[in-house]
């Protein structure tokens, strides 16, 4: 990956041993930016990186991503054209065939329709090329860590799906390219929706979206929709019962339990808050950035829990926010821990994301354990 940016969000990552020789930076001067000369340096910079890797006995990548930020957004740079020019510069040489793709990391678009991680996912899957379809192959897209030990994989395997591919489990670039043979895609994160739409348009791979939610009734409805669309049978009664049992266990042990919820967690803070309230718990405060897609949750929260307060993490005045005076019994999310340092906390931000009934069950158990450990 070649960075043409401020690098403030990547310098720490690139210093980690596992990322050595995978991140490179192209220095630019102000005159280069003003005149546009920085764009002419990109093909040579890519070639220099590839030659460095070759000369040092490192693995030559199959693709190079050019990571750019707000500078070129303001300049209106056509990065697709820049990448095509960089690929053309490699044609005829020893590095011919290496793909070059843009990676838009515009902080300006973070609250827009296409935030950076939407672009990243779309760029990654744009590398897939047409391939003969396999009726027993499915892709699970949206996460960068694998779904492990979830009922979703079990349901698909019982339905005769032989290949359940995730980008995080692909050991080689060739294995990644085999994702193009999928009969359909399962989208588990809304930020991958644009990538799924692109794959449907380019490779004729349809998709179904299974949103990560914490309402067991909604989870059941999603699995029924998956079964109908995919033409498979799914019996989720046992898993649903286990999740409901974990909810009941927590409610019985801690009746009237009150939560504060942050957004630095494996959940949509507003959906999680609404689900907890419908389970019979209470939510005092939510620390999260409100986006249009969350209005439906806020509307229901206003009806079911009008006293719940919402604080925007992006609001500058949060600098003056004092330690929460909430009477909450437990918090979920690392940011909630910051605002409520003296209240038991469940970070719930592991790399391997929870999903479905397993996610509900594990979260209830984590909250139970945190309260028990705190002596509540």
What are these regions (language model features)?
Residues 1-376:
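An N-terminal assembly and electron-transfer interface module characteristic of large anaerobic redox
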